Amino acid sequence: MIKINISLEESRVKYSDRHDGAVAFMQQLRRDEEDFTGWVNWPSEIPSEWMDGMKRAADDVRSKCDKLIVIGIGGSYLGTAAVLEALGGSKPGCPEILYAGNNMSGYYLADFKEVVENNEVCLCVVSKSGGTMESRLAFSVLKDWMYEKYGREETAKRIVAVTDPVKGILREEANHEGYVTFEIPGNIGGRYSAFTPGIMFPLAVAGVDIETFVNGAKEIASDDAFWQKGLDYALARFALYESGKEIEVIEYYDPSLRLIGEWCKQLYGEREGKEGKGLFPASLTLSTDLHSMGQFLQEGHQIFFETIFNVVNRDKDVTVPESAGPDLAGRSLNDINAMAVKGVMAAHAKANIPMIKIDIEEMDEYTLGQLLYFLMMTAAVTGKLMGIDPFNQPGVEDYKQEIRNLLGQ
């Protein structure tokens, strides 16, 4: 059952002239005719031994620690963090998942070490090459700290490496030290890695049902109706871009979707921001950010359109007590939040702001699998419509090289 629905009535943009080209590209995607498109059919192709291996390793890690530190940056950790936050964190009795290697702040890492000092810890380092600066620094610091805490032999038993199957400095170290390892498939780029071991292994440790997560993606990957929904969203995004919109503001009225927004920013920013093109992805938590950005959204320079992620059903709620006053007492807080969605959209429609609403039926593993796959597909199609390669990110090497120059590398 498809649990992602899209409403384009508010976009008020015609895009039928691009339909045929987008359909042709989607057909190429489904036939895996482009480089780095292994992610398209991957949910149906994941080897059963990989799934079993991740589950066994997750059981082992759970028996050893109460904190699993995921070391990675960008797509190497954001998928894990986004899914876990949306689900409310680790399941009872499972280790808390913490994140390092996503910045180069000495203060952050020093403080991080103090936070976990008295905990039982395992590491999961996610890096295809092992050479990414942020991850390399954090891994070296935390590994040395674990040597002092556990000794070298025991530390090796507490490290899981997700990396290239044959090459790279992390693969060499993992082979030498005897770490448990999982592969990052060579034809899947990091920004499309939501269903690879780098994301799914930490989720398994946290008690997430990774089979159900993958099944959500697997069902819609083979569903023509789903691909049409993705096509509609991609075409609408491109048409709004062509009409002069420069920013897509991703909005959600549930704070648990904050990291889904961050994941989208990385996905869209690196897929589309090339050759002077692309939509700039921003994200807002509403109603919170209405008290800082609401004025701009309503009456500011209209270089943006809005995409609203709306969770229809949540499994927890609060009834407003009598003390709140007769106009609110007895109401469901989730119902009031739903009225806020409608009210804000009505106000923004009067201001002629283009809006796209994506309804997410409920927030569980199955639906999240559908949502992440849906967003990856629309990013690929929109990028292709813009005339850029949606599967590379050459510009990120420029700043990395400048940093290496300053470090004398």
Residue ranges and their predicted role:
Residues Y150-E306, G395-Q409:
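Active-site phosphate/pyrophosphate-binding segments
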Residues D59-A225, N405:
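Glycine-rich phosphate-binding loops that contact phosphosugars or nucleotide phosphates
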Residues A282-D364:
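Helicase-primase coupling helices
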Residues A86-E96, W145, L267-G278, A347-A351:
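Short helix-loop-beta junction
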